[in-house]
Amino acid sequence: RIYHRTGFECGWRYGNVEKENSMKRRVVVTGLGAVTPVGNTVEEFWSSVREGKVGIGPITKFDTSEYKVKLAAEVKGFSAKERMDFKAAKRMEPFAQYAVAAAKEAFEDAKIDMSQENPYRAGVIVGSGIGSLQAVETNYEKILQKGPSRVNPLMVPLMISNMAAGNVSIQLGFKGKCTSVVTACASGTHCIGDGFRAIAYGDLDLCVAGGAESCICPSGVAGFTALTALSDSEDPEKASIPFDKDRNGFVLGEGAGIVMLEELEHAKKRGARIYAEVVGYGATGDAYHITSPAENGEGAGMAMKLAMEEAGAQPEQIDYINAHGTSTHHNDLYETRAIRYALGAAADQVVVNSTKSIIGHLLGAAGGVEFVTCVKSIQDGFIHQTMGTKETEEECSLDYAIGAPVEKEITYALTNSLGFGGHNASLLLKKYEG
């Protein structure tokens, strides 16, 4: 395979970075929302993370007796009618319900008063990698059993992935830019990155951004199993073990992670609490393979470099990386190479972990929840342990927070997402210092 020289090796940059940055507005995080396998609010989620609770267990959503894979990371005890208008919720599939619940939490956390806001300056960028496989399954069964005339008239709007963003917009009354990025497992991170850009360059003042997913269902589990992507371990403590020498696939998870992004001066004017600042975003394509990341890590590494370049941050300034870390053989090895490609010698000084060791792989929602994890880590000076991981292989040789969490002051945190098709996204957060 031929690998072309990268832009950094050739000595060029994407545009006039100094000029572009001088025109940008600063973007901060003022609200957090999450629905996860270890808690249905940010408070519940973060408490579980700090306690080292793992949200993986036997699949309860359908009979797995004929399935090789028995475990998943399901959302537990979620009640849509307690989180949103119940009539509206009945016209949403679970992924959209999770999105609305997390978005409302972020909105309320940010204490936005829409009577004081221009709704056309408030946007929604929320993605889902898949949308609803369940709606397809249910209605296909109706076609087989009762004929095509019995299909639910709402099948299409229930199924399509952009309805996460659509329903959030409807429920919050946000009338500005409303889009949905679909880049498989990088969807949530791309959405937050696009929200960051929309505010930085003046399209919006407020943006709820992130991802939502729910596809723990027969076709979802069967499809990923056929791809040999899922772990077939029946021990919840040993199923999702990123970077471990015995890893054998990811654990399918579900949920949503959505944040409120806001232009700094807008946030200060209304006296908002500021959690952190978003200072860099990098997005690249591997142009390599439909499921595997590039073996040399160049594409993902370049995304990290671009995020750092935008922020004017040096590799040695990065304190923490929340890795994509799926627990598949290829991803974890190639992402390790990507981190070394991006950070060089400084890679040996950074702490890396994988939240998927706790909540499994939330696909399009993963980046949103992992962004929330980075914000809370910066806030608390706490990097959670990569749960279950005991011993790494030779080339996976970074500090993966194995065996215990790490107490550390964090100024800069990177979060990575890699999606099928070669989609790479990295976001750089910074501790807010005024």
Placement of each model-derived feature along the sequence:
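Conserved beta-ketoacyl condensing-enzyme motif
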Residues: 29, 45-46, 50-183, 212-221, ...
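A glycine- and small-aliphatic-rich helix-loop capping segment at beta-alpha/alpha-beta transitions
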Residues: 43-48, 134-148, 198-201, 221-234, ...
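Condensing-enzyme catalytic core mediating Claisen C-C bond formation in acyl metabolism
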Residues: 26-30, 57, 235-311, 320, ...
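Acyl-CoA/ACP chain-elongation machinery
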Residues: 203-248, 281-295, 325-332, 349-399
